Swiss-Prot record:
Pfam families: KH_2, Ribosomal_S3_C. GO terms for molecular function: mRNA binding; rRNA binding; structural constituent of ribosome. Keywords: Ribonucleoprotein, Ribosomal protein, RNA-binding, rRNA-binding. GO terms for biological process: translation. It comes from Vibrio cholerae serotype O1 (strain ATCC 39315 / El Tor Inaba N16961). HAMAP family: Ribosomal_uS3_B. This is Small ribosomal subunit protein uS3. The gene is rpsC. Residues 39-107 form the KH type-2 domain.
Amino acid sequence: MGQKVHPNGIRLGIVKPWNATWFANTKDFADNLDGDFKVRQYLSKELANASLSRIVIERPAKSIRVTIHTARPGVVIGKKGEDVEKLRAAVAKIAGVPAQINIAEVRKPELDGQLVADSIASQLERRVMFRRAMKRAVQNAMRLGAKGIKVEVSGRLGGAEIARSEWYREGRVPLHTLRADIDYATSSAHTTYGVIGVKVWIFKGEILGGMPAATEAAEPKADKPKKQRKGRK
């Protein structure tokens, strides 16, 4: 059986940025990693209804900065910023350092892999037919400018006795092209028959030149003039 590498992991540093950017000494590394995990876990639970796309964590000078990418910023911020202040206090308590929270709005949720996967999962939990949910997600993504999209659901589809997988694809999804901007995400729907897994791949186009560090290395070096050896004419 052909095994597939994680589409986001293989593109890190090429066309995909990291979700956590910080440096730590050996003794602090495990604590920071554990703090990151607990912060993500807390925010995912608290903002379950806020259409959460991704959480980016930075740690500048003994503090923590969390950027929440969401399609519904109003739900996260709350009235006069009350909710975001509660989140800031909770994150500071979990991490043990002063916290700052930034909100970034996702303009096109139909082109965000995580939001599409969560949307399909929530529809399956509401007993919507899985083929209808898949086709609707694919059509919306293509209508808003995606170059290609693939959706796969697996489990006891439609309450069947034997679990199976079904997928639907439209357009191109070139997983082997490293410069391809592919947004991959997973989600799970907890139904009365069991858990149904959802996977989404969205191809948004190719990023030429890669990330800034890659472009600097790719610049051609000017040829140095060769020195003539002594005694030769």
